[in-house]
Structures are given as C-alpha cells and as structure tokens.
C-alpha cells in the first residue's frame, strides 16, 4: 500500500521511513511544504470574505423586498442557505486547520466539519435539481395548466434537506465515516479505505449513483428540454427580435448553469471514484486536495449564476446597496420591460431567469 492507514485516518504516504504521524496530533508538513498550507488558508479566507457577503445579501434583499418573495425564490434562498452552511461549517474550520498544518480539532471535530461541509454541498446540489425540474415543468409544460406555487416550493425545499441528510448523516452513524483527506486539514467521506466495520464500499457506490449520477441526468434532461422548447417557440413566432433575445438569454443561462455544475462536481467526483476503485494506488495529497477545494467555490459562483443573472433581483440588490436608489435605473428598467416582452413572446412568464 502506498499510504498509511491508522485509527480513523488515511495519510497518502507510505510510512516506510517512519515519518508519518496522525493528522489529528501533528503538523503534516512532510506531505507538502508549509507555504502550501498557508496558500490553502488564504484561499479559504478568500472564499469566506466573498461567499458570506453575497449569500447573506441574497437573504437580506429577499426579506427586504416583498416582490422577491416568490415561490421560486424559496429555492434560491435555500441555495444561499446551503452556501452559508459551507462557509460557516466548513470554510472557517478549514482555514483555521490549514494555518496549523493539520486537523487540530481531533477526531471529535472531524465529524461535524465533514457533516456541515457535505450537508451544505448536497443542499446546493439538490437545490439545483429542484430548479431544473421547476424550469422544465413551467416552461416545457409536460403537465397542462401547471403553476409553480408556494406549496411546491416548500416541498422542493424539504426535498433538498431530506436528500442532503441522506448523504451527510450516514457517516455519523456508522455507514462509512468522515476522515481527514488530501493535505489532512479538512474532513470528507472515506473513499480511501474499506474497513468492514464501516461498509465504505456500499456507501460510496450509493453516493455516486444517488447523489451524483441521478442529479446529473435530471439537470441535463430538464435543461436540454428547456432549450429545445425555447427554440421551438422562437421558430413559431417567426424569430422576432424579442424572441431571439429571449432564446439567447435562456440558452446562455442554461449553458452557464450546466457548466457550473460540471466544473464544480466532476473533477472531485472523478478523483474520488479513481481513489475508491484503485485502492492502494500511489497518489499525492494535492491530488485530492485541489478538486475538493475547487468544488467549494460553488458557494461563491452559485449566487452569481442563479441570482445575479436575475434582472429583478439585481435591480433590488443595487437599490438596497445604494440606499434606496438605483443609479442604473434607466438601464435596469429597460431590461425589465424587455424581459417581460420576451417572456410573453415565448408563451411563458418563466422563461427568463427566475
């Protein structure tokens, strides 16, 4: 084996030289240089100072402006809450442990850190699935006369919490476990070992199928159908200027949504699956650290994609930040009017983002 397995940890380095130490008790500077941990801490600090304001502002603006309290925005707020879970439950802890070069909170602290990071990520992922499903139902109309209401939104929020818990809770109760990963200063699901007492193998397979493959299929299907529907609507209206604009806006939004999902999850999932299916293979600590920490950027670009591209929300946000006035009032007003015209042209009030 090219790694060292200990009590509730796996260090990706052979202990043939005897230098490997528990990541709960000793700095792991034999894995990578101290400056690498400092860079990791700086990166987490950047995510904190950007992720917290933009997600908190999302919550505040929605509460401040009554017109934003729509059923669909319940899901967007849930997305912001999930990102805040990642910021407070994962990013702050990881920044602190990175400054010390090891997981200073010990085995007791590894469980809550891994839990909150996993819960926040899964809440965000399943919120995207609910958004994709809502867009498909409203725009493509597979069920005639369907209107996305408050009850549907509440059901969607409850669904995201339920699915997130079905992934984050099992490692706390004995189905798999949370252990330090990569550079040993953050905790995640154990892809590295297969102790019979924890049934890691069955949990990882379950997680990849239910919490990665299925969401990916749903998102691709829903947004694929949405783009096709908008194209068909544009053709039926003889491709008027407003319809073409609507098609471009929706297509751009969908492409960014899908790319964001892929960029966030595929590198991490691919590396985790490789490690899981190549037990004992040689890989360095950075091999898992880079995709794992890159996936955390979802807490920053999620609100940018799903909220900042929403004209109405952007207008309210600028108004809030500028003490009740929007210096871009004319531009925003024209955009809002155009958006309404475009929505009418494609026979759906929900074609433009949210």
From Swiss-Prot:
Region (Disordered): 333-354
S-palmitoyl cysteine-type lipidated residues: 322-323
One function term, GO molecular function aspect: G protein-coupled photoreceptor activity
GO cellular component term, pick one: membrane
Low complexity bias locations: 334-354
Post-translational modification remark: Phosphorylated on some or all of the serine and threonine residues present in the C-terminal region. Contains one covalently linked retinal chromophore.
Cytoplasmic compartment segments: 62-73, 134-152, 225-252, 309-354
Principal location listed in the UniProt entry: membrane
Annotated keywords: Cell projection, Chromophore, Disulfide bond, G-protein coupled receptor, Glycoprotein, Lipoprotein, Membrane, Palmitate, Phosphoprotein, Photoreceptor protein, Receptor, Retinal protein, Sensory transduction, Transducer, Transmembrane, Transmembrane helix, Vision
CDD domains in the record: 7tmA_MWS_opsin
Annotated positions for site Plays an important role in the conformation switch to the active conformation: 113
Residue positions where N6-(retinylidene)lysine is found in the record: 296
Residues passing through the membrane, by range: 37-61, 74-96, 111-133, 153-173, 203-224, 253-274, 287-308
Record's bilayer topology term: Multi-pass membrane protein
Extracellular face of the membrane: 1-36, 97-110, 174-202, 275-286
GO term, biological process aspect, one: visual perception
Top-rank lineage group of the source organism: Eukaryota
Keyword Membrane: yes
Pfam families: 7tm_1, Rhodopsin_N
Disulphide linkage map: 110-187
Chain's role: Photoreceptor required for image-forming vision at low light intensity. While most salt water fish species use retinal as chromophore, most freshwater fish use 3-dehydroretinal, or a mixture of retinal and 3-dehydroretinal. Light-induced isomerization of 11-cis to all-trans retinal triggers a conformational change that activates signaling via G-proteins. Subsequent receptor phosphorylation mediates displacement of the bound G-protein alpha subunit by arrestin and terminates signaling.
Protein name: Rhodopsin
Lineage: Eukaryota, Metazoa, Chordata, Craniata, Vertebrata
């Amino acid at each position: 084996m090219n790694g060292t397995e200990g009590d509730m940890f796996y260090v990706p380095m052979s202990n043939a030289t005897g230098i490997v130490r528990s990541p709960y008790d000793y700095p792991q500077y034999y894995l990578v240089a101290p400056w690498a941990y400092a860079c990791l801490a700086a990166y987490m600090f950047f995510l904190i100072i950007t992720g917290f304001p933009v997600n908190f502002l999302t919550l505040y603006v929605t509460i401040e402006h009554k017109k934003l309290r729509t059923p669909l925005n319940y899901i967007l707020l849930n997305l912001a809450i999930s990102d805040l879970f990642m910021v407070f439950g994962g990013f702050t802890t990881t920044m602190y442990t990175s400054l010390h070069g090891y997981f200073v909170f010990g085995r007791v602290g590894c469980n809550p850190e891994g839990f909150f990071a996993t819960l926040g990520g899964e809440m965000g992922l399943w919120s995207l699935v609910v958004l994709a499903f809502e867009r498909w139902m409203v725009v493509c109309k597979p069920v005639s006369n369907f209107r996305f209401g408050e009850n549907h939104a509440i059901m969607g929020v409850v669904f995201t919490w339920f699915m997130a818990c079905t992934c984050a809770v099992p490692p706390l109760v004995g189905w798999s476990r949370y252990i330090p990963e990569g550079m040993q200063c953050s905790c995640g699901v154990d892809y590295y070992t297969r102790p019979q007492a924890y049934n890691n193998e069955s949990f990882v397979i379950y997680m990849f199928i239910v919490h990665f493959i299925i969401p990916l299929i749903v998102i691709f299907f829903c947004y694929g159908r949405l783009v096709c529907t908008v194209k068909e609507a544009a053709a039926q209206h003889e491709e008027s200027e407003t319809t073409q604009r609507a098609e471009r806006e929706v297509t751009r939004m969908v492409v960014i949504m899908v790319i964001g999902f892929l960029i966030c999850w595929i590198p991490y999932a691919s590396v985790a699956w490789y490690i899981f299916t190549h037990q004992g293979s040689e890989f360095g600590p950075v091999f898992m650290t880079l995709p794992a920490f890159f996936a955390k950027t979802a807490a920053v670009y999620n609100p940018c994609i799903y909220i900042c591209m929403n004209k109405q929300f952007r207008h309210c946000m600028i108004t809030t930040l500028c003490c009740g006035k929007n210096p871009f009032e004319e531009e925003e007003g024209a955009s809002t009017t155009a958006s309404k015209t475009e929505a009418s042209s494609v026979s759906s009030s929900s074609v433009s983002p949210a």
